Amino acid sequence: MAASETVLRVPLGSVSQSCYLASFFVNSTPNLSFKPVSRNRKTVRCTNSHEVSSVPKHSFHSSNSVLKGKKFVSTICKCQKHDVEESIRSTLLPSDGLSSELKSDLDEMPLPVNGSVSSNGNAQSVGTKSIEDEAWDLLRQSVVFYCGSPIGTIAANDPNSTSVLNYDQVFIRDFIPSGIAFLLKGEYDIVRNFILYTLQLQSWEKTMDCHSPGQGLMPCSFKVKTVPLDGDDSMTEEVLDPDFGEAAIGRVAPVDSGLWWIILLRAYGKCTGDLSVQERVDVQTGIKMILKLCLADGFDMFPTLLVTDGSCMIDRRMGIHGHPLEIQALFYSALVCAREMLTPEDGSADLIRALNNRLVALNFHIREYYWLDLKKINEIYRYQTEEYSYDAVNKFNIYPDQIPSWLVDFMPNRGGYLIGNLQPAHMDFRFFTLGNLWSIVSSLASNDQSHAILDFIEAKWAELVADMPLKICYPAMEGEEWRIITGSDPKNTPWSYHNGGAWPTLLWQLTVASIKMGRPEIAEKAVELAERRISLDKWPEYYDTKRARFIGKQARLYQTWSIAGYLVAKLLLANPAAAKFLTSEEDSDLRNAFSCMLSANPRRTRGPKKAQQPFIV
């Protein structure tokens, strides 16, 4: 086993094959006893009694368990998985994708309103209430249990899929909307367990090809496995098996996992009022380890976080390596959340000072250099290049010819957005939805910029939302650009998956941003649009074509974060005040520091620099 594995030992002969472990709906936390087994291994015993339970009807199936009424019955001891009895019908694209001509023709086909076309051509209608009920049932079916307690939700529960890959695992980023949905519903245990168990995984040894990344790295995903106990066939052990990118397609590093973990931790405290979790010594240490990894000194001259391609929601090669907006927005949000939660102590003074300095610099950098509107495009169009000066206007030596032809006519007179990436001599002018929305939520964007982003989305509704919210980025790369940048990725063909596909899970971020800015009608319109199809389409992972007419050619059905994203949007629209659990407001200290930077001489301070003290974690 890997180092520091977390184990539950269950004697096979001591209980029947169907063991009542825990109830998901009862606020109960298992009693766990820690017993060191070896230097790099730790055992977790569940001391709750195991008893056979009589169960009522109405069972829900998941990948390794059955939820019956309000009781959970484990089927792990049988080494079996339940087959889903209901056959699912779906409309999928050919595996080789669609030609551009066919996509254009299909985009002109009308879609039914308030329903989807069935096999006999008749429209089927599903009420809003029934959609929510179905979504909650599906979300609870996706719950994964460990030590008798809910610990997360699997990525997808698609019974039609012939290849599971890693969709049966609990992904950190995928669980965020699920966790928020449970928090807003008043079901807190699953989020608390998720936070604490993933924290244990942070300290695991992570090695790929003899190289180990930083200690604070959070896993991309994990899976609950049941294996025979070494040396004792009469015992089994439940093992948390994490993936830090060693097994992921492309071996991508999950940079966003730790950032999302901090954001969820803060949301848990805000929503429950229980600050005891974030004040725990091990949780405080986990926060500091993530910050230490993110704030480490490097060669970069920018305050933004330098990452490789595929390090966030867009986890395939899409030309976002460098300083992608999504990572910067999550980074800023995590810094703000950590600033609230870190307990004051002597050992944290230097870390908090570095955190505050980075917040101010990052805020200034994104607002000044990532912002794009019609005025800024005209400014770039007139840029002088090859400027060698401390007060150069074109600091990053951006060539005006980089302005893409589509952008000139696409940018509305009113509104703007934050570009996708910025590096020396390179600006990625694509609109990335998650990065822009989370910049609003976290106050990385200014108040005026936040309203302008929403103005932009409204002005370009037909392109960014079309028939199913919400495009992950716009526009899609096509032709030679697609071949060079994606490496001819067959999954990221134009207007599919990460390359301009529509992702329903983004509904919840749009809702939080809209409510924060006092414009909930934007989210209401998007949710109403999604309700026309998403249930009858079996909750797909993403949609294809320019107007999102088809279920994605490789999209999983019953994708958990599509389900959870819809539920969070509905819960927040029903109770807009709850959005404050997720948003951050710019405080006066940061605002004053930002104003000072704007008015200061752009020439950098020169001279010897005082040595910084290392962070002690």
UniProtKB/Swiss-Prot annotation:
Keywords: Carbohydrate metabolism, Chloroplast, Glycosidase, Hydrolase, Phosphoprotein, Plastid, Transit peptide. Expressed in roots, leaves and flowers. This is Alkaline/neutral invertase E, chloroplastic. GO terms for cellular component: chloroplast. GO terms for biological process: cotyledon development; starch metabolic process; sucrose catabolic process. It holds the Pfam family Glyco_hydro_100. The keyword Chloroplast applies. PANTHER family: ALKALINE_NEUTRAL INVERTASE E, CHLOROPLASTIC (PTHR31916:SF36), PTHR31916. Residues 1-45 form a transit peptide. The lineage of its organism: Eukaryota, Viridiplantae, Streptophyta, Embryophyta, Tracheophyta. Belongs to the glycosyl hydrolase 100 family. GO terms for molecular function: endo-alpha-N-acetylgalactosaminidase activity; sucrose alpha-glucosidase activity. Chloroplastic invertase that cleaves sucrose into glucose and fructose and is associated with the development of the photosynthetic apparatus and the assimilation of nitrogen in seedlings to control the sucrose to hexose ratio. Participates in the carbon flux between the cytosol and plastids in leaves. Its main location: plastid. It comes from Arabidopsis thaliana. Its EC number is 3.2.1.26. It catalyses: Hydrolysis of terminal non-reducing beta-D-fructofuranoside residues in beta-D-fructofuranosides. Changing residue 294 to Y: In sicy-192; inhibition of cotyledon greening when treated with sucrose; no effect on enzymatic activity. Disruption phenotype: No visible phenotype under normal growth conditions, but the mutant plants accumulate decreased amount of starch during the day. The modification Phosphoserine is found at residue 87. It comes from the Eukaryota. Transmembrane segments: none annotated. It is found in: Plastid, Chloroplast.
